Amino acid sequence: MKVHFDRTYNHPMEAVWAALTDARAIRQWWVDTDFRAEPGHEFFFRDKPQGKWDGVVRGRVLEVEPGRRVRFTWDGGGHQTVVEFRLEPAEGGGTRLLLSHDGFRGLSGLFLATMLRFGWGKYVNTILPETAKHLADKGFGVPFDRPSKAATVGIAASA
């Protein structure tokens, strides 16, 4: 089973890439992390624990085409899956994001994929484009207009 999103944003590829791959931006729109878009880098994504899940997803960056594509493992919720973000110039300007999250197996994989489809949808439709817009308009030098996602769920940001 696969989770897939195809979205177009009216923001430059550089801003969308930064929103997806720079830990400072990821903390803003998603979760606490030490992510770096470098092949072989092992990282974590830390969210608020829920039920038996400790809130931590671990992964390793598999492939990077700087500014265009990053592919990494996702080890969380009892499943090992693979996520890919691919960016393309959009017709008429802006950036097209193709997100795929693949490798879900069995009934528990179906359940996890359903939950992640909801979560990814929320992020790619609202918070990610807001973050990319901020980066395109103001960069990292100007504080974001709202608290980071990591802060709103009570997660202390990493250095």
Residue ranges and their predicted role:
Residues 103-159:
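A conserved amphipathic terminal alpha-helix motif
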Residues 11, 52, 56, 111-115:
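Residues at secondary-structure transition points
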Residues 31-35, 41-44, 49-94, 100-105:
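Hydrophobic-ligand binding "helix-grip"
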Residues 17-20, 29-30, 74, 85, ...:
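Tryptophan-centric aromatic hotspots in well-structured domains and transmembrane helices
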Residues 14, 68, 126:
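Glycine-centered loop/turn positions within well-structured domains
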Residues 1-34, 153-159:
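Hydrophobic ligand-binding cavity/cleft-lining segments
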